[in-house]
Every structure is written in C-alpha cells, then in structure tokens.
Amino acid sequence: MNSVIIINGSPRKDGNTAKMCRAFAEGVKLQLQDATVETVNLYDFDFKGCRSCFACKLKGSKNYGHCSVKDSIMPILEKAAQADILVFGSPIFLIDISAQMKAFLERLIFQFATYEAGYKTIAPKRCNVATIYTMNVPKEMFPETIVANIESFIGHVFNQPKRICAFNTYQFSDYSKYAVEVFDEESKRKYRDCIFPVELEAAFNMGMKMAENIE
C-alpha cells in the first residue's frame, strides 16, 4: 500500500497552509483510493532541530544514517523516510519557512546526507516530494533564493520537490480587530475569493499527478 506523509509546518490546523495540504491530499485520494495519507501537524510535537551530536555520522555505529535523538518526533521521521510521497507545507515567516519546519528538515535530511565521497545519500527511499508555501505577500516578493536552498538539500537526499504556492493570503477573519495599514483588506478578500481557489486547485491537481506517477 502506498504511503503519503504530509507535514504541516504551520501553527494553524485550519489555516491557508493546512487547506493547501488538504487539497493535495484530496487529489492523492482521488487517484489512489487505497493509499495511506497521513497529515502531521508539527506544532503538536515537542522537539528541537539537529543537536550537532554527529551520532548519525559515527563509523561502525548502529546509529549511522539515523538520528539518535529520542523524542516525540522520532516516529514521524521514521515514517517520512519510508513514504512514497512526502509533502512539506509551510507558511513563510520572516522570508523563510517556519522554525518548526526548519527543525524537522534538519533532523530528517542530515541523517541521510553523508560525508562519504560525493556526499552520498543513504535515504532508504528516493521518494517523490512536493513543497507547499503560503505567504501574505504577492508573488514578486516570494523568497525564491531561500526556499531553493533548502529544496536543493531535499532534492539531494530524496528527489527534487515539485513546488506549489499560495500568495497574498487572507490572514485574519476580521481585519477590523487588528492594526494593519500596509495591506488593503478589500483587495485581500478579492484575492482570497478569486485566486485562492485556483491555488487550491493547483495543489489538488499536483496531488493527483504525483499519485498517478507513483512507482
């Protein structure tokens, strides 16, 4: 049975990132009805990023190629490593992915990215990967260089990710309650009503396409 693991790196379980992840999952399920699709909300877990202990690089060790830190995120790291499709969804905070997503990727990727010749990867599966980003800024302000950097590491260990974005997101249910002068609520609402559904459809279609091409 095919396994799809979707990692939601947003603190919101029903926000824009979660909705994009959900749309992707629905696309997968339509194409692969017997697939196991699991969504993981990182903010439900108490964990930290890489501790630089280098246990995963120790010659002859049983931990070689495996993160040795035993905490609540460990079972998720193990599931992710065996997935057929991996999805990393994150809001953009301060021109970067969320801290929780960064910490998770440190733990997941570094254990498999060896210092052997050619920086050999020892991931148990070269799974297909998608990245989903949501942000409250327009497309021209998307931090392409920053996300491309982390995607290069993901691509080295697994496969180069397929990227899906949602821009100019609607942040608050009631803008009148917040001090917001740099965004126009009406234009944000129009974007949400007209464009966000198109972005959700793109996530849905990507889920279908990746499920169709699963090996």
Show which residues each predicted segment covers.
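Short aromatic-enriched loop/helix-cap "lid" or pocket-rim segments at secondary-structure transitions
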Residues: G49-C53, P143-E144, S173-Y178
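Short, catalytically relevant binding-site loops at active-site mouths
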Residues: F93-I95, V137-P138, Y170
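N-terminal beta1-alpha1-beta2 submodule of the flavodoxin-like/Rossmannoid cofactor-binding fold
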Residues: M1-A117, V182-E215
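Short, glycine-/small-residue-rich phosphate/pyrophosphate-handling segment
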Residues: A99-Q100, A113-I164
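Generic recognition of cysteine residues
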Residues: C21, C127, C165-A166, C194
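Beta-strand-loop-alpha "switch" segments that mediate conformational coupling across diverse proteins
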Residues: K162-S173
